[in-house]
Amino acid sequence: MELEILSKQNPWWKDKAEIENDEDIRKWKDGKRKWVPSEINEISLKPFSLNFIFGPRQVGKTTLLKLLIKKLLEEGVEKERIFYFRCDKLTDFKELDEVLKTYFEFRKSKNISSSFIFLDEVTFPKEWFRTIKFYIDTGDFKNDVLVLTGSLSMYLKKEVELFPGRRGFGKDIIMMPLTFREFIKVFSPEIYEKIPKIERIEKEEIFKKAYEALPYFDRIQELFKKYLKIGGFPLAVKNEEITQDVKESYWAWIKSDLAKIDRSEEIFKRIAKAILEKMPSAISLNSIAKEFDISTHKTVFEYLDVMEKMFIVKILYHIELDKIIPNLKKNRKICFVDPFFFYLFSDICLTNLPDESVLVENVVASHLSRKFDSFYWKNQREIDVVIRSEEIIGFEVKWSEKADDFSKIKIGKMRNIFCLTKDLIDKEKNLIPISLFLTIL
């Protein structure tokens, strides 16, 4: 492969200031709203490291890589030590091999023994892992830091599991849409700086931090309503709206991913419609199959698994509170990982948006599931979300003007249940506003 092809993707080799003219960096700088993803600090930069970055489409993985490259250059890393290549035009592992051979020859000519190697969309070339494994085993990467991004095939085909004992100091990093707390940082950094974060899910800690944030409640509530409308995907945040172009672009990516794994677009849409129409109730795989004309419950299970691995949904299983284990046979709750998917699938599936209260409960469940093993519980009454932290804790979501006293309710090993409200706060009754809780989470 010609070195010139590599040079086009690494303009900083000529002049490190050229990183400022990179298309992704330029778009980032020109954005009305911009931020540096927190994941930039999670990537291991100690040789040898093989890092994998996962996440949904259009969540900003490429921008993250470019911002890290910019940071390394600003810190004085020799420009030729930084190698970036976008792999979506490569056919197979042999072409990836040619790319790496060309870079190895180049760095040898510069007497470089340690590099930062960024391979974006590395899962596009077929059997890409063969080349990476080969150069790890031959020792060519022994002094390098590798950062690889890819699609859901890394999960579905379990390709990451093909590197046992070959990761070094590397990490798996999941990059998700902005949480509500991160959303506040983008839109009101001056408030974000004053808002504390809870260290653990414990009553005294939660209410101490909640009361510290309470003076900013009006602005927090205003931003929460905005978050419900646009979610945390970068394009929606930058535009401050979910445009039709953004929805069409994301749906095109989903269809492309489905085609690669030989899954039906029509069945996918039926299940997405079922999720929207059944929320926030727990669903039966059998009933979804019958009601939405899908062959078997196994098909529904398989597509939900695909959706979860595409970082579109999170599945919450019923928890048995005596044994503290999930019951996989009972109905399961499905939540979208970001409000954006409500608007996308409502449009694509030609179905109405659910009530705002449903969207709010979904946001709570998705936020808690990012940090904790999350479930739900139902018997005579239902607890919307149950988390397994240092202890078993329940959360009931009430997007209304009234709320019950949850301080005295104990169910099995769940000794604490908090009621997340629209705007009520009462430590004695375990009541705390939803927006305030998500702000300090």
Protein language model regions, located:
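N-terminal pre-Walker A segment at the start of P-loop NTPase domains
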Residues: 1-44
